[in-house]
Amino acid sequence: MATGPVVHPQPVRGDPIDLKNAAAKNRRALGDIGNVDSLIGVEGGKLNRPITRNFRAQLLENAQVAAAANKKAPILDGVTKKQEVVRAVQKKARGDKREPSKPIEVIVISPDTNEVAKAKENKKKVTYSSVLDARSKAASKTLDIDYVDKENDLAAVEYVEDMYIFYKEVVNESKPQMYMHTQPEIDEKMRSILIDWLVEVHVKFDLSPETLYLTVNIIDRFLSLKTVPRRELQLVGVSALLIASKYEEIWPPQVNDLVYVTDNSYNSRQILVMEKTILGNLEWYLTVPTQYVFLVRFIKASGSDQKLENLVHFLAELGLMHHDSLMFCPSMLAASAVYTARCCLNKTPTWTDTLKFHTGYSESQLMDCSKLLAFIHSKAGESKLRGVLKKYSKLGRGAVALISPAKSLMSSAP
């Protein structure tokens, strides 16, 4: 059955009209649903006249004139709030001649700007400890060796003193003990041969100095914990070099390259197994203050030139080859290398207040270790182990291996 729109019957003229329903239909539009016109409610309460188009335009024009006088944003029709219109009309009616308020300057600060500002503010702050350090240095005539790096954020000048205090406190925790009496198949000569060979490999691969010192530290710590047969000593050395290279270098040598330098005495699997064995025995503890960490600081405190710096490294690497150097901690070995080098070059004074302050050692405390280094230096030319001597005989390193040993330390050398 088709459906269509329903047509309601229209009232016939003369029929009675339902006044009750008609009253409901004749309510004022928008009078009770909250959509109140924004221009109703000006001064004097309710308007006593209907809002015509002309009257509404007049009110809006008055409000815009008042806003322009106050240097405010122009009022758009239907957007301005009721209170703003009321204030504008009232102000115009009473002729308020107060000066308009000045616009507020808004400064937008990004999070990065906040961090930079805080960093600069913290950098300008002077701590009480830094004041005490500065006074103590001035009293003892020590030089501020970090002055040139104060503007270099990477130098971490504000932390460097605390870092080296910490290094000196923990240096003995990673210091290897003298262990030759616990190794039935290895002696001091074999260890010296191994270190000399590692120096040549280190030069061949052009590795950083940190890698060499960490390699020797790993070897000595491992041999002080575990007995190693003679046939595996070179395997321990090359595996320690691999570990140190992975820790210090951006591009460590490949395992196959290390197999090659051993003349295929070991295969890659043996090197990787020994690497895992060493790390397990050391409990993966590789972040240690080696002798090189202190050498960098003490050379800076010495105010040395390139010749003195090369000579210090030469003496330190000669000391690495000798088992007797394990009697001394890395910080003392580094300080003694600086002292011995200054004696070789006849620097005056031999030991300054600045060196004493930064190393923590007096001249008398370094005497035994310095005499040992001077003795090793004097015997280097007679030794068959030429790795370190060849390295520092080149002009690129100042040929410092040709410098004579310190005579002042040789008179009572061991």
Curated annotation (Swiss-Prot):
SS bond list: none
Expressing tissues: Expressed in roots, stems and flowers.
Any one biological process term the GO annotation gives: mitotic cell cycle phase transition
The entry's keywords: Cell cycle, Cell division, Cyclin
GO molecular function: cyclin-dependent protein serine/threonine kinase regulator activity
Database matches in InterPro entries: Cyclin, Cyclin-like_dom, Cyclin-like_sf, Cyclin_A/B-like, Cyclin_C-dom, Cyclin_N, Cyclins_cyclin-box
Family, similarity comment: Belongs to the cyclin family. Cyclin AB subfamily.
The protein's name in its UniProt record: Cyclin-B1-3
Originating species: Arabidopsis thaliana
Species lineage: Eukaryota, Viridiplantae, Streptophyta, Embryophyta, Tracheophyta
